[in-house]
Amino acid sequence: MKTVVVDFSNLDDLSGFGEIARNYAPRLAKVSDALPTLHFIFIVPERHKGEFGCHIDYVSREHLKSDIKPYAHQIDLWHATHQQFKYRMHGKGIHQLLTVHDLNYLHEKHGIHLLKHKLKMPLMIRRSDTVIVISEYVKHDVEAHIPLLNKELQVIYNGISDVEQQEQRKPAFAGDTDKFFLCIGQVREKKNLHTLIPMMKYFPQHKLFICGANHWSYADTLRALIAPADRERILLTGKIADDEKCWLYAHAEALLFPSRLEGFGIPVLEAMRFGTKVFSSRYSCLPEVCACHASYWDSYAPEAMAQVVKEGLASWSRDGAEAEAARTYSRTFNYDRYTEQYVSLYHKLTADSR
């Protein structure tokens, strides 16, 4: 039997890494009971130890270095599920698997902070035996900027949860009869949200809800762009609960996603599950992930953006053929497939170990 360590340190995080951990951990635990050749050790926050069954071993994120020592000579494979991991054990016979989600630091960091990442990421990849990326876009980014030393990159797309089957709850900021557009994600400069605010003058009967963590200074930049008369119409709501998110997807006229930097772009696929029209930028991975199931902005002039939205909505019905095609497409990105692909990879990588 081979022993595989999987890092689920981010289980409690309200982030993309946390979302993946909360979906992947229970599915992997469920299928692992029927995998006689693999034994799993999950790295989890202390309070989650034992949560996924007694057939799994657990080490706590808080005491990782000490808790993992008794297993040191048993480990065949260590899966760092993202590039921001805090620790991984290196040793003879331990195959290092790394999943890379993006190289956004190339576009976001400057000066000494950029230099730090430019030094750290190649070292991280050099010390990995196998590297997985979450989109073709990320694959091309890594190949263009990091020496791979003959490593072949493999793409395993993220899954998304079955949000359309989850409970819904109307947020307090949403009225019963509001017509609104939705934007979901961290309120950061890379999300390009400032382009939406002048566009909204062409939709005086609509509200715009920008939902997500907004403690960065960019949120203040957006607030300054919102005219006093529009402050009840264009809202930075802050973080929202999952049931609120599902209600908003189900009732929004459209999801607006002008982001410049995405490793994957989960909200566009989640919106499709509800038959909600998606408007997207053509930047980074978004054309790859949305494919033909979104309308795209080629200009960020407010009137041109508004025209794309008006034309897209005019031919869209939540119950129409285009919406159903988008739903079907979105369902191909699921965590059952994601789990199956990683389990297959674990089998392959441990076949010749030790």
Residue ranges of model-derived segments:
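Carbohydrate transferase catalytic cores enriched for Leloir-type hexosyltransferases
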Residues: 1-354
